[in-house]
């Protein structure tokens, strides 16, 4: 079904102005064909935005190749500071947009009759900028570029394949989301153990997972669960980390079941 993934026809009408999709699910790890989806949206005359917060840290991204009108990323998911993000936009689109807030350095001229605004991106960056966060985010992005995004992707693809094999057959464990095109994000449930209780045991074993809805409660419920645990890979994850999860889960099963 991955090959058929696209925007449903009924979701695109002549009234559609903007289509926003995620590049990679932070719950399921599913990687979406955003280039194809962008073409669909543009055929209907709509703008196209990619939420790449989960996507951009795991593989190369070329906004010109994707032909997206907007692309958003966060700082903390790119190994950078919290409280900052980036919105890429095609300049011709940004030029048509009014500022959403006012403040210093985003105004060109002010008179009693009218105000003119600076060209993008300055018109969207009102007030004192988050200079420290911006410098930190820039260094984080430079670090990933030096490592090479293709190298990071190859490393994580190997871990993802290994985890599918190792975790997919664990007794009493269900992996949530099994798309072929998948990144290093694994949500899972263990029969008879609440994810929060499981996380407590895993934490004692030196394994950090997140539990809950992962800011996507409708999706988690659509998959048939109230809450799930999630293990994610990064550029620092190694095979030994993947191998550490099964015995830790077995310890939790012995404790609670």
Where do the model's predicted regions map?
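Pyridoxal 5′-phosphate
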Residues: 1-4, 8-257
């Amino acid at each position: 079904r991955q090959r058929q993934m696209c925007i449903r026809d009924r979701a695109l009408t002549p009234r559609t102005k903007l289509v926003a999709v995620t590049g990679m699910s932070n719950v399921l790890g599913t990687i979406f064909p955003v280039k194809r989806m962008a073409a669909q949206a543009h055929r209907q005359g709509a703008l196209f935005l990619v939420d790449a917060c989960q996507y951009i840290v795991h593989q190369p991204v070329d906004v010109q190749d994707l032909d997206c009108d907007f692309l958003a990323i966060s700082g903390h998911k790119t190994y950078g500071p919290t409280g900052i993000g980036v919105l890429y936009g095609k300049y011709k689109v940004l030029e048509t947009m009014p500022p959403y807030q006012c403040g210093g350095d985003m105004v060109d001229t002010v008179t009693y009759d009218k105000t003119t605004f600076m060209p993008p991106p300055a018109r969207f960056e009102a007030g004192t900028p988050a200079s420290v966060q911006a410098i930190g985010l820039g260094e984080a992005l430079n670090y990933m570029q030096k490592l090479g995004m293709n190298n990071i992707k190859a490393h994580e693809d190997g871990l993802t394949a290994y985890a599918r094999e190792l975790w997919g057959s664990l007794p009493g464990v269900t992996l949530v989301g099994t798309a072929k095109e998948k990144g290093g994000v694994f949500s899972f449930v263990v029969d008879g153990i609440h994810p929060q209780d499981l996380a407590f045991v895993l934490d004692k074993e030196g394994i950090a997972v997140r539990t809950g809805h992962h800011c996507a409660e409708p999706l988690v419920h659509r998959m048939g669960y109230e809450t799930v645990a999630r293990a994610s890979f990064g550029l620092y994850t190694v095979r030994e980390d993947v191998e550490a999860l099964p015995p830790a889960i077995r310890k939790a099963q012995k404790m609670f079941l």
